[in-house]
Regions:
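N-terminal, Lys/Arg-enriched amphipathic/low-complexity engagement segments
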Residues: 20-55
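Repetitive helical segments and hydrophobic/amphipathic motifs
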Residues: 11-14
Length: 172
């Protein structure tokens, strides 16, 4: 099962050209049903992550319908368990309708309330050595953003240095 999660994460990352974070630029009030679905997904994900014993995972969500590209998930970030217990997600989003992006640290609830196409998630668990190395980096805002490039392009070149796409940041 872990292999499938890694394959899904890799496919998502390699398909960054088509991927978006799923954020609509249209002002839209969330419905009670949307909030309930997002919070339920956050709770289910937290329980599953807690049960996994992992401290750090690559976490993906289905922000928009990318099925025409053969993709199921559109956005990913790094999730880590805090010493207090809750999970936090560090991920990059562009400012709506602009070519400027920032790295955000959110709880699972906020991560899954971001106008999802489908209320489902997938994650991959890195090796214990990778988790141990990433945990202090993710918990430290300055270190977590060291490779962040504010200039955003949805179709940025993976080896380019001028622009950066959301999923590209997570992989770098």
């Amino acid at each position: 099962m872990r292999t499938l999660h890694w394959i899904a994460a890799a496919a998502l990352a390699l398909a960054g050209v088509a991927a978006h974070a799923g954020r609509s630029c249209e002002p839209r009030q969330p419905t009670a049903q949307t909030i309930a679905q997002g919070m339920q997904l956050a709770q289910q994900t937290a329980q599953a992550l807690d049960a996994s014993g992992a401290r750090v995972v690559v976490l993906a969500r289905a922000g928009q319908d990318l099925s025409r590209y053969g993709l199921r998930y559109s956005h990913l970030g790094w999730a880590y368990r805090t010493p207090e217990g809750p999970w936090r997600v560090v991920h990059k989003l562009n400012d709506c309708g602009t070519a400027v992006a920032a790295v955000y640290r959110q709880g699972l609830g906020e991560f899954f309330l971001d106008d999802l196409w489908r209320h489902e998630a997938v994650w991959a668990v890195p090796t214990p050595a990778v988790q141990q190395a990433l945990l202090p980096v993710l918990a430290d805002g300055a270190r977590a953003t060291r490779l962040h490039q504010r200039a955003y392009s949805m179709v940025s070149y993976a080896w380019g240095t001028k622009y950066q796409q959301s999923n590209q940041w997570a992989l770098e």
